[in-house]
Amino acid sequence: VSPTPEPARLRTIPSRLLAGAALVADRLVGERLAAEDAHKWHFAVLVTLAEAGAASQAELSRRTGIYRSDMVAVLNELADAACIRREPAPADRRRNVISLTPAGRRRLERLDTVIADAQRELLAPLTTGEQDELVRLLGLLTEHHRPPHPRPQRGAR
């Protein structure tokens, strides 16, 4: 027995379609990462460190959108897995600088594969050109609505 279809008008509201696609995407990525004993915040921090280099906890929070209070737990988990190193900042020994370790780079390589697999599953109904166009359009929407100083979202692990 197939579910009752949504009313046609609901299937034409972009915000509703985006929300539905976001739920599916979040579930797919979350399940794939959980199978690797990881979550999307681990991935975000590892990517940020790999691309931008060592950073303070506050800078990582700004760049990833993860609240500072939540960042502590994420960094503790990554440190426990030897994926990051915390060292006192040369200019201010009260502050820590977080950097990626070789184990963190290997972990990121594995998570990159996991994320890519989830993206392939999510976007399977689309051609390569449609996938590229979707990414371009979503980027435009996101950039257009980005506040001047984005506030990190709470609890979106």
Which stretches of residues belong to each language-model region?
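Charged, amphipathic alpha-helical coiled-coil/dimerization segments
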Residues: 54, 76-143
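Short, locally clustered residues in the helix-turn-helix/winged-helix DNA-binding domain
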Residues: 19-22, 47-51, 112, 139
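N-terminal leader segment of winged-helix/HTH proteins
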Residues: 1-36, 83, 152-157
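The alpha-helix within a helix-turn-helix
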Residues: 61
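C-terminal regulatory/oligomerization modules of transcriptional regulators
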Residues: 1-9, 128-157
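Helix-turn-helix DNA-binding elements, focusing on the entry/boundary residues of the two helices
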Residues: 57
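Short alpha-helical elements of helix-turn-helix
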Residues: 12-16, 36-47, 69, 132
